[in-house]
Amino acid sequence: MHPQVVILSLILHLADSVAGSVKVGGEAGPSVTLPCHYSGAVTSMCWNRGSCSLFTCQNGIVWTNGTHVTYRKDTRYKLLGDLSRRDVSLTIENTAVSDSGVYCCRVEHRGWFNDMKITVSLEIVPPKVTTTPIVTTVPTVTTVRTSTTVPTTTTVPMTTVPTTTVPTTMSIPTTTTVLTTMTVSTTTSVPTTTSIPTTTSVPVTTTVSTFVPPMPLPRQNHEPVATSPSSPQPAETHPTTLQGAIRREPTSSPLYSYTTDGNDTVTESSDGLWNNNQTQLFLEHSLLTANTTKGIYAGVCISVLVLLALLGVIIAKKYFFKKEVQQLSVSFSSLQIKALQNAVEKEVQAEDNIYIENSLYATD
């Protein structure tokens, strides 16, 4: 036998059996089925993305054990056929243009180099774009002008109305009522005790008037009793009907007023004193209010200063406490280092103190 014939037969046996190739096309979107069927006993198979290899599916996307799918690379890859009837066609759902390419259906049979291989070429094209013409209907508006002339006749009856003169009498009653009654109710409460914190010195000029009657009669003088400057009520002089009187009055102060009637009766009025007391009370109230306001402001300022001082003390304490802790930690670490150095020095000194004493009486 020729050697060439032997070599060719060996190559055919080593190569897997190829059933053929199929071409499948479709548009992107719908599902596409790649056909694959085999005969004989139910056996395992695989689908490979790419051309069929020599021994196994190197880029397998679906594997079966003959009756069930054991591996699926993507959920879009499905075997919808009856595996027990040897229908192992591959269905790809939601296809895209990127799915185009070569697929290999490999069915494994018993024995060496007996696998069946089917090569499927898939071509997916983009979906066709359908252009729908748009028809626009424009309604036509027709305008019809109609002119209608209607004769208009208007009859207005003329009626003469007699003139009537109506006498008009206008009477305007005038009533003027003037009420000139004025009632003034004045209630004056003079406090019996008045505390005036300030001392006011008022110069007093004393004028002594003496009336000499034409006839010598016994004369009686009523002089006011001297009072202290703190007394709010001045000394009063009772009215006298005597023909001679000596009166001491302050001429520079408007607090006193005197009236004299025809019978030489002297009457003293205390309105000026009451007005002075009211003015002094108002001044005292104003001073008290101002002092209270100043006290409130001073209290608020003092409170703020106290709070700021407390805050500064707390911050200073925290700062010094941290500083002391750091100093203690540094001193503690330095003490440990010194202790270790002392221990090392003692050990070295102890080793230096060891010496060897040779015996003077050495034996042969």
Swiss-Prot record:
Q: What is the tissue localization of expression for this protein?
A: Widely expressed, with highest levels in kidney and testis. Expressed by activated CD4+ T-cells during the development of helper T-cells responses.
Query: Topological domains (Extracellular): residue ranges?
Result: 21-295
Which Pfam family is one of this chain's hits? V-set
- Impact after mutating K338R: About 50% loss of ubiquitination
What are the boundaries of the region 12 X 6 AA approximate tandem repeats of V-P-T-T-T-T]? 138-207
Q: Which residues are glycosylated?
A: N65, N263, N277, N291
Q: How would you describe this protein's topology in the membrane?
A: Single-pass type I membrane protein
Q: Does the keyword Zinc apply?
A: no
Q: How is it modified after translation?
A: Ubiquitinated at two lysine residues Lys-338 and Lys-346 on its cytoplasmic domain. Ubiquitination promotes receptor endocytosis and target receptors for lysosomal degradation and termination of receptor signaling.
Question: sequence repeat ranges?
Answer: 138-143, 144-149, 150-155, 156-160, 161-165, 166-171, 172-177, 178-183, 184-189, 190-195, 196-201, 202-207
Q: Where is the Ig-like V-type domain?
A: 21-121
The record's subcellular locations are: Cell membrane
Predominant cellular place of this UniProt entry's protein: membrane
The UniProt record describes its induction as:
Up-regulated in the kidney in renal diseases (at protein level).
Signal peptide (residue range):
1-20
Biased segments, Polar residues type: 227-243
Cross-link Glycyl lysine isopeptide (Lys-Gly) (interchain with G-Cter in ubiquitin): give the residues: K338, K346
All ranges on the Cytoplasmic side of the membrane:
317-364
Q: Which GO terms describe its molecular function?
A: phosphatidylserine binding; virus receptor activity
Which stretches are transmembrane? Answer: 296-316
Q: Which UniProt keywords apply?
A: Cell membrane, Disulfide bond, Glycoprotein, Host cell receptor for virus entry, Host-virus interaction, Immunoglobulin domain, Isopeptide bond, Membrane, Receptor, Repeat, Signal, Transmembrane, Transmembrane helix, Ubl conjugation
Q: What else is known?
A: The extracellular part of the protein can be cleaved and detected in urine and is in correlation with the expression in the kidney.
The entry's function note states: Phosphatidylserine receptor that plays an important functional role in regulatory B-cells homeostasis including generation, expansion and suppressor functions. As P-selectin/SELPLG ligand, plays a specialized role in activated but not naive T-cell trafficking during inflammatory responses. Controls thereby T-cell accumulation in the inflamed central nervous system (CNS) and the induction of autoimmune disease. Also regulates expression of various anti-inflammatory cytokines and co-inhibitory ligands including IL10. Acts as a regulator of T-cell proliferation. (Microbial infection) Acts as a receptor for Hepatitis A virus.
Assembly behavior: Interacts with STAM. Interacts with SELPLG.
Name of the protein described by the UniProt record: Hepatitis A virus cellular receptor 1
* Species of the source: Homo sapiens
